[in-house]
Amino acid sequence: MLTETDERHLRRAIALAGTARAAGDGPFGSLLVAADGRVLAEEVNTERTDDDITAHPELKLARWAARRLAADEAGRATMYTSCQPCGMCATAIERSGLGRVVYALSTEQLAGLRPADAAPPVAYAGPALFDEARAAVEPS
């Protein structure tokens, strides 16, 4: 269940998405909010502007948090975002230690609204060469 505060911040994320869209970028916006309600940072999608397919607002905020927030502060922070984070962004969010994400549109809802933006399927093969791979990653 979302609080009124959650809804207010989520509306800001949606407004940021509109800003990105108006600039010709993907319609995605996000903000990071501290446990005390302070807005720590805001970002918009800049994939076209920066000619960078990884210029997602969620990824930029996860990087920001990893560099600037103590682990306990990150764990109490909330990211508000206009759409459910993609796999790349979700991994960065988890690795940054952020404790909570609130999003407006789900991945499925977004795909229904913007089918042309769906990523093409990729063929993955693996796991393979377990012993060799294990030797590369196992602690000495």
Q: What is the predicted function of each stretch?
A:
Residues 44-45:
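Residue-level structural signal for beta-strand termini and adjacent loop
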Residues 49-59, 64:
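A short, polar/charged loop-to-alpha-helix boundary motif
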Residues 28-37:
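Short beta-strand scaffold segments in enzyme catalytic cores
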Residues 24-28, 75:
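Short, basic and Ser/Thr-rich N-terminal targeting/leader segments
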Residues 71-83:
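Immediate flanking context of iron-sulfur cluster ligation sites
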Residues 1-20, 85, 91-140:
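Zinc-dependent deaminase
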